[in-house]
A protein has these predicted regions:
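CN hydrolase (nitrilase-like) catalytic-core segments centered on the catalytic cysteine
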Residues: 71-89, 155-251
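Active-site beta-strand/loop signature of hydrolases that rely on acidic residues for catalysis
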Residues: 29, 40-67, 90-91, 153, ...
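Short, glycine-anchored, charge-dense loop/turn motifs used at functional sites
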Residues: 106-115, 236-243
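Short beta-strand scaffold segments in enzyme catalytic cores
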Residues: 92-94, 104-108, 137, 233-235, ...
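N-terminal glycine-/serine-/threonine-rich phosphate-binding loop
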Residues: 1-47
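Active-site glycine-rich loop that binds ribose-phosphate moieties when present
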Residues: 124-137, 152-158
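A short, polar/charged loop-to-alpha-helix boundary motif
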Residues: 120-133, 249-261
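Active-site-proximal beta-strand elements of phosphoester/diester hydrolases
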Residues: 11-23, 105, 117-119, 138, ...
Length: 261
């Protein structure tokens, strides 16, 4: 990745995207991802991190198997190519169709190529239609080694431990925790946001301190056709302290500098 302009201090500048990801609209979501990559480029970032299932939107494979996509799908490959055009790497989410199975997957692309994937190793409620990933991936990114934790994986130790044991120096937590019941006013949005702040951000803080690693979060935000998501983009330091974050549940992006020494 020579020529990508990593920071002189050895750190990595990252854009964390808490965006709305429409269900069943890979092309529309692709356009939004490309816009975010351009925003990241203009902000001097080397990496953009997107939420769980960001490209496909959340998918229930038992009900809508047609919304899951293979890794060679045009939208997956086009987004990988866009990382070369923007000179910004990307970690993005999809519901992956793999032969007769489905996985919840984060794909890492850089320099115009799909480099590798992390499949979800610990499933949450209502995810029985998915297969469990068995491998732990770590992606080299300049001076950083990136591990990935996907939503419900944050609530257990073994996924974090496996990524740390594989050499991850920075852990990226990508989530799409659908809220039970629609959000219809500010009070209901705030209630869902507070739950995820306590649960999701709380897990990020606990594991950051336990493992002595930086943790960066990107969560789906806003309303889709039949489900709402609580947002939160944040950076947590190795002591478990939140050093940067978006203020509430609304969609947005957050640029952070992560030390790697």
């Amino acid at each position: 990745m020579a020529g990508w302009g990593f920071r002189d201090d050895g750190g990595v500048r990252v854009l964390l995207a808490s965006i709305t990801c429409a269900k069943g609209d890979a092309e529309g979501n692709l356009a939004r991802h490309v816009e975010v990559l351009d925003e990241a480029r203009r902000a001097g970032c080397e990496l953009a991190v997107f939420p769980e299932m960001s490209l496909t939107g959340s998918v229930e494979p038992d009900r809508h198997p047609e919304r899951a996509v293979p890794l060679d799908h045009a939208a997956v490959q086009r987004l990988a190519e866009a990382t070369g055009e923007a000179e910004v790497a990307a970690l993005y989410g999809l519901a992956e169709a793999a032969d007769d199975r489905f996985f919840i997957t984060q794909a890492y692309a850089a320099g115009g190529q799909l480099v590798g994937v992390q499949r979800k190793r610990h499933l949450g409620e209502d995810e029985e239609g998915y297969a469990v990933g068995t491998d732990t991936a770590v992606f080299g990114h300049g001076p950083a080694r990136l591990g990935v934790v996907i939503c419900a994986e944050a609530g257990v130790d073994h996924t974090w431990d496996a990524s740390a044991a594989a050499g991850a120096s920075v852990l990226l937590m990508c989530s799409a925790p659908g809220l039970y019941g629609r959000r219809t006013d500010e009070a209901s949005w705030r209630s869902g946001f507070t739950w995820w702040e306590d649960c999701g951000l709380g897990d990020a803080r606990r594991h950051a301190a336990r493992l002595g690693r930086w943790v960066a979060m990107a969560t789906q935000a806003g309303s889709t056709a039949d489900e709402d998501f609580p947002g939160i983009a944040a950076l947590v330091d190795p002591a478990g302290e939140v050093v940067a974050r978006l203020p509430d549940w609304r969609p947005g992006t957050l640029v952070v500098d992560i030390p790697t020494d």
